[in-house]
């Protein structure tokens, strides 16, 4: 999968050796020149085990394992320069530490501007529909527009006031990320005109997931290809149809663009079906509730997912 695609999704059941597989994959990518400086990030509770597993598998490997002291305010700049200026076989750190790495402000500006453009397009479509649009839907999009404008203003200020001594992710030369327990980053921002549809999740997303998008886009721009990251999880999709779309948003932006899928609504129009049911609310009244309940065009969607996914179950490992 890594040699053919340059990344993807490891949909591996818990207990099937995911940690060792990840360490071997990172080292082999470096050895085969598929990546020059791979990075592994994991949960704070697991990251020491990941580093120990890597070191046990490859005792002579040059690993940079980030300690809590390395990410103290006094040492952080020196540590970032250490990543930038040295040719490590692998850099290993926790999710929280990864979130403290500055991202390229110019790239942030481009991504946030693209998100804002999509919101403005959605607002224009809704305004043209006139009376058929709920006030809540308009209000939600206008709030999202305001939040994106505030983020853009902050990034523009960072560009103007930037000093040359700040090393960001782009300058570090990381060209592949292995993300252990990748479901921790599933709450990525997305744009939609759907209002009060159950099961969509929070379209605003989290800053943690947005930072991951910035990092992955940095790698994709450097290589000129999709992927550039490997997601490893036992629960890649748990409780929302949007989670599948967001995996593609992270990893397959060029392919989505080729299919003219530029937002969640365009994807849902092709691959998901919305139903309307009558349910009891908290006050025991019957209310109408919309939700995305089914995937449609399942063979095409499965093929799209399987192109970049490696499956492993306990039964398949003889467990």
Model-predicted regions and their roles:
Residues 5-25:
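Walker A/P-loop
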Residues 13, 24-29, 50, 215, ...:
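Hydrophobic residues on the short alpha-helix immediately C-terminal to a glycine-rich phosphate/catalytic loop
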Residues 29-35, 251-256:
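Post-Walker A helix-loop "phosphate-sensing" segment adjacent to the P-loop in P-loop NTPases
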Residues 76-121, 135-139, 143-176, 184-186, ...:
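Inter-lobe coupling linker of SF2 helicases/translocases
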Residues 109-131, 135, 190-205:
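A solvent-exposed, charged loop/short amphipathic helix patch at secondary-structure junctions
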């Amino acid at each position: 999968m890594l040699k053919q695609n340059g990344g993807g999704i490891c949909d591996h059941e818990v207990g099937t050796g995911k940690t060792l597989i990840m360490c071997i994959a990172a080292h082999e990518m470096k050895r085969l020149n598929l990546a020059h400086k791979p990075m592994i990030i994991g949960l704070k509770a697991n990251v020491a085990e990941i580093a120990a597993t890597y070191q046990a598998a490859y005792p002579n490997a040059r690993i940079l394992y980030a300690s809590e002291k390395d990410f103290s305010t006094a040492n952080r700049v020196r540590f970032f320069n250490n990543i930038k200026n040295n040719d490590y076989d692998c850099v290993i750190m926790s999710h929280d530490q990864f979130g403290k790495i500055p991202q390229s402000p110019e790239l942030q500006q481009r991504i946030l501007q693209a998100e804002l453009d999509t919101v403005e397009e959605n607002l224009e479509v809704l305004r043209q529909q006139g009376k058929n649009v709920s006030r809540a839907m308009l209000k939600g999009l206008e709030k999202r527009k305001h939040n994106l404008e505030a983020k853009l203003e902050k990034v523009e200020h960072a560009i103007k006031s930037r000093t040359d001594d700040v090393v960001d992710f782009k300058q570090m030369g990381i060209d592949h990320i292995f993300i252990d327990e990748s479901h921790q980053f599933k709450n990525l921002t997305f744009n939609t005109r759907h209002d009060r549809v159950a099961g969509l999740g929070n379209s605003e997303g989290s800053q943690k997931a947005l930072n991951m998008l910035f990092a992955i886009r940095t790698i994709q721009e450097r290589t000129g290809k999709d992927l550039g990251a490997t997601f490893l999880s036992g629960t890649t999709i748990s409780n929302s149809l949007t989670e599948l779309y967001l995996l593609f948003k992270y990893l397959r932006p060029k392919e989505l663009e080729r299919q003219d899928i530029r937002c969640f609504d365009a994807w849902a129009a092709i691959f998901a079906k919305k139903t309307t049911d009558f349910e009891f609310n908290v006050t025991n009244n019957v209310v109408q509730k919309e939700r995305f309940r089914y995937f449609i065009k399942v063979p095409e969607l499965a093929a799209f997912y399987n192109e970049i996914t490696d499956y492993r179950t306990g039964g398949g490992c003889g467990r």
